[in-house]
């Protein structure tokens, strides 16, 4: 269900944000298929049917979120994994409601699982922010393009905003390091 929500939600947002941009001029059926394809591939393989460098800022953000979350455990997709996100959402919800514990489907979440999910999320965010800052110091590209490259590297997706070929060697090393960490 988490994967379905990600795919459908990502596709709908991509379609809305790109209808008058990279999807303009395509038949509606093709726009829907491209949106679904983009939503799936942003979490996994990094293939593209549209020019990712020409995406709107909103679409880049949605794509970065999909790359950050990635796929489900057991898949070859990168990212922090859907289960990590679900554990953290349940944890936040339980704390906002001041519940005694975190329960999912009538089962209590173990404190260790919550701790591990928090560490994965915080470590990934730290590496993404650090990588973005290093690349911004060294490169004259827009923040959204640099962040797109960093999220893609960390999520081991392979998508590009089109700047990878033009970055300096130090920035390439940052991206390679993030790929290994991801």
Which residues are covered by each model-predicted region?
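Membrane-proximal intracellular helices of multi-pass ion channels
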Residues: 1-182
């Amino acid at each position: 269900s988490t994967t379905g929500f990600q795919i459908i939600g990502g596709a709908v947002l991509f379609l809305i944000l790109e209808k008058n941009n990279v999807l303009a001029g395509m038949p509606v059926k093709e726009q829907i298929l491209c949106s679904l394809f983009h939503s799936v591939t942003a979490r996994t393989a990094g293939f593209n049917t549209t020019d990712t460098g020409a995406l709107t800022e909103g679409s880049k953000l949605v794509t970065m979120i999909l790359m950050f979350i990635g796929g489900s455990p057991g898949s070859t997709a990168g990212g922090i994994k859907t289960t990590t996100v679900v554990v953290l959402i349940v944890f936040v919800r339980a704390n906002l409601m001041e519940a005694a514990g975190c329960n999912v489907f009538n089962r209590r979440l173990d404190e260790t699982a919550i701790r591990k999910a928090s560490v994965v999320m915080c470590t990934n965010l730290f590496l993404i922010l650090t990588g973005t800052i290093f690349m911004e110091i060294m490169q004259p590209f827009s923040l959204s393009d640099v962040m797109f490259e960093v999220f893609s590297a960390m999520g081991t997706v392979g998508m590009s905003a089109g700047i990878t070929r033009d970055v300096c060697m130090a920035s390439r090393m940052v991206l390679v390091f993030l790929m290994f960490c991801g």
